[in-house]
Amino acid sequence: MSEYKDTLNLPETGFPMRGNLANREPEMLERWYKEDLYGEIRKAKKGKKSFVLHDGPPYANGDIHIGHALNKILKDIIIKSKTLSGFDAPYIPGWDCHGLPIELMVEKKVGKPGQKVTAAEFREKCREYAAGQVEGQKESFKRLGIMGEWDKPYRTMDFATEANIIRALGKIASNGHLLKGFKPVHWCTDCGSALAEAEVEYKDKVSPSIDVRFKTADEAALLSKFELTEGHEGKGDVSIVIWTTTPWTLPANRAVCLRDDLEYVLIQVEGDNPERIIVAAELAKDVMDRAGIEHFHNLGFAKGADLELSQFQHPFYDFTVPAILGDHVTTDSGTGVVHTAPGHGQEDFAVGQKYNLEVANPVGSNGVYLPDTELFAGQHVFKANDAVVETLKEKGALLHHHAYEHSYPHCWRHKTPIIFRATPQWFVSMDQAGLRAKALESIKGVQWMPEWGQSRIEGMIEGRPEWCISRQRTWGVPIALFVHKETAELHPNTLELIEKVAKLVEEKGIQAWWDVDAAELLGDEAEQYEKVLDTLDVWFDSGVTHFSVVDAREEYNGNSADLYLEGSDQHRGWFQSSLISSIAMKGVAPYKQVLTHGFVVDGHGRKMSKSIGNVVAPKDVTNKLGADILRLWVASTDYTGEVAVSDEILKRSADAYRRIRNTARFFLANLNGFNPATDIVPAEEMVALDRWAVGRALAAQEEIIKAYDEYNIHAVTQRLMQFCSIEMGSFYLDVIKDRQYTAKQGGHAQRSCQTALYYIVEALVRWMAPIMSFTADEIWNEMPGEREKFVFTGEWFDGLFGLAEGEELNNEFWTEIQKVRGAVNKLLEAARAEKTIGGALQAELTLFADDALAAKINKLEDELRFVLLTSAAAVKPLSEKSDAAQATDIEGLFVEVKATEAEKCDRCWHHTPDVGTIAGHEKICGRCVSNVDGKGEVRKFA
C-alpha cells in the first residue's frame, strides 16, 4: 500500500474535527470586531429592500439569563437570514434604563433621594448604574455571536431618546388622549407608587371572606318594595348583606351595588334572635349554609331595579350609603350585593361616577390609614383586616367570617400583595377620543404569530382600563407639563412648551426639567401654572420607541418596524404599550408582524429557579460548550411554546452539532487540491450521482429559505440535519468515498465529485450561517476559491441546479436505488455477523430481480458495485433465482451474498480477478493501474 499512498487523493483540511468552540469563538469575535463585520454587512446591503426588526429593550439591571439568550439569538437568526435573502436589515439593540429596580439598587448604595443625596445627584447615580449594567449585558450578548449596532445601541436614558419620549407625550396630548383623574390604580405599598398592568402578577393569597350586614335606614320604605301582605312583614332588624374579601376597604365604602335584573329575596331568619336579610335569590341557600342558619323562610321578592337608591347604614360609621345598580354584579359567588368603595376599585369607581359618589381614599402611599381615619388610623391595611372584622362583630354587623384562598394581584418586583388606591394620576384615555376602537381595528391588519396572539391582545385591549402613565418616582422621564393652579387645565401652548423642554433635555438630559425655571418657558404666566413633577411609566418609555428610536434613527431610513419579537408575556406589556401609543400618536400599528416565543423551563417543564437549582446561565454554556451549541439549541426548538433546557438537552444539541461539523469537514477535506476557477466540471458532463446530490441540495435550500422566511427556525434545523445525516452522510458521501480517494488525481471522475462537493458546501455554509455563525465563518475561511471576507455579507448560493427534465437517472430512480441499497445492506450485515464475509468489499452479490426492477438497476451497468460498496455485483432475472438467494423487504428482489475468491487490490481494497495480472503493478487491480498510470477510470453513473 505504502508505494501507492501518494497516488491516492487523501482528504486534508485545516478545519479541525473538534470545534473547541469555548476557546476559539472569542478569537473569531475579536476578528469580527477588528475587521468591522457588522459595518461590512451594512455596506454590502446599502440600498437593498429594508427589513426592520425592532428590539424590545431588556431592563438594564443584572446579568442576562437564558430567556434573554433565547430572545436575542432568535432575533439574530432572523436578521442574518434576512440579510442572506438580500434585505438591508439593521439591528439596533436597546435597553430600558429608567424605573424602580434601578432606583432600589442605587438607594442601597447612596440612600433615598432628598436624604443623603439630592434628587439631581440621585438621578446621576442612577444613570451611571444603568450605563454599567448596559455594558455588562452588551458583552454577554456579543459573546453569543449577535451582530448589531453595539457601539450605538439605543438606551431610553440617552438624552435624544428622553427628549423624544417627551415629544411623544406631547403628541398624545395634542391628539386628545391624555386625561388627568383621581382614580383607583394598582398601587404597591412597598414601591410607594402606581403600577402598570404589566407590572402586576396574580398569585394565590388567603384573605378573610366576610358577609356584612348593612341595616336599612328606612325600614318602611324598603319593605314596601317587596310587596308583602299585611301581617306578614316579619320581625327583627332588616339588613342587606354584602360579601367581600378586602375588609380593609370598608372604611371607604360609599354604596352597596345590585344588578337591575336580578331577583332579591327578603328572608326571615327564625329563632331567638330573629332578623330579616336581603340577598340575591339565587345565592340565598349558599349564604344561609355559610352562616349556619337552618331555620328561615322567604317573605318576599324584589328586582334590583326596584331597590335602587334605598338607603342603608354604614356598618361602623355614622352615615348612610345608597343601593346603586351595576352590570359587574354576578351570582358566581358572594351574596349578589357588592360592597362599593370607589377609591379602591376600578369597577367601583366607574359605577360610582354614574351616581356621583365620593371617591374616598383613607390610605396613604405606604399602605397605612391616614391620621384622620376613624377607628383605624395608623394601621397598615393588610394588618387592619382583623381589626375591621373585630369592629364588625362589636357592631353586630358580621354575619359570617372564614379564611378564603383566591387569586390576588401582587407586585412583580416585591412579590407582595398590592391594593387599589385612588390618587391623582395621568392617564392615556382608552375611550375619550376613540383610542380603544382604533386599536382594536388596527390589530386586524397585523400578522400575529402564533395566530392566538391576535385574540389574546384583542381581549386585553377590550378589557383594559385607562393606562395610568404617571409615577411618583425620581428616576424617570418627567411628565413635562404645566397645569393651571386653579383650573388644573393644561397650558394652551402645551405642544410648543413640550418642544422647548425636549430641546433642553436633548442637551442636558431629564434633569433639565427639574432645573428649568417656569418663568424661562412661561414668562409672566409662570405664577398661574405649576410644573407636573411625576415621571412616566417605564412602559411608556419603551412603548414609544417606535417613535423615539425607529422613526429617529437614520439606520432605518424612515422605515417603520416590520417585526416585533418577544416573549408571550408582552401581549400585556410591550406589544400593548407600543400599539396604544402608536395609535394615539400616528393612528397606525407600530408593527406589521408580531412573533412570540414561550418561556424557558427545565427538562421537567419547571420554571427556572435558584431554589430548585435548575437555572442554566448562558455564560456557563458558552464557557463549557460554546455559543454555537446554545444557538443550535435555540434553533432546534419549537419556540412558540415552552422551551426546555437542561444539561441533557444541551448535550443533544452538542451531538447534533458534531454531526453537522463532521459533514462539513468531509466536504472541506475532500476539496483538497480543488480550484473552482480551473477545475469545475460543467453540469452536463458531471457523473449522474453528483448531479443528483447537487439537486438534493437545491431542494433542501428551497425548503430552508422558505422556513427561514416563515420564522420556522426549528424546521430549518430539521432539514439541515436530514440533509447532512441522511441524504449526504448515509448515502452520497458513503458512495463517493471510493471514487474520491482512488480516482486519478485531477481526472474527470474526481473533479466531478469535487464540483458537487464545492457547490453543496457553498450552499451549506450559508444555511448554517444564521444559526451556527462561528462555525459557518470557520468553514468559509477554509473553502477553496476567491470569496468575500465574510459569509454574512453575501446571499444564498445561486449556483445549485436540479436534475434535467426527463433525465433517465432522475430523483425517483435514485430513491429506488437507495431502497435496494438498504435491503442489500441488511443481508451484508447478516453475512458479516455469520462470519461469511469480513467486510462488504469481501462480498460478491447477485441480485435476482423482476423485469421492471432489473431494468432500473441495470442502468448503473458495472457501477452498481460502487453504489452497493461491494467488490462485485451482478443482476439476473428473478426466474434464475438460486437456492442461496435470500428474500429482501423489496417485492421482486432476492439477493445472494457470497465471499469473493478474488485477490484484494492493495490500493483500493476491492477484490477483482485482474489483481496481479498487470506487469509492473502486481499488487493492484486494472482500475487502479488506469488511475495511477493511465487516463483514469471512466465513471458515468456513480
Curated annotation (Swiss-Prot):
Swiss-Prot/TrEMBL GO biological process terms: isoleucyl-tRNA aminoacylation
EC number of the protein: 6.1.1.5
Motif ('HIGH' region): 58-68
Cofactor(s) annotated in UniProt: Zn(2+)
Free-text note regarding domains: IleRS has two distinct active sites: one for aminoacylation and one for editing. The misactivated valine is translocated from the active site to the editing site, which sterically excludes the correctly activated isoleucine. The single editing site contains two valyl binding pockets, one specific for each substrate (Val-AMP or Val-tRNA(Ile)).
PANTHER family, A to Z: ISOLEUCINE--TRNA LIGASE, MITOCHONDRIAL, SOLEUCYL-TRNA SYNTHETASE
Protein name: Isoleucine--tRNA ligase
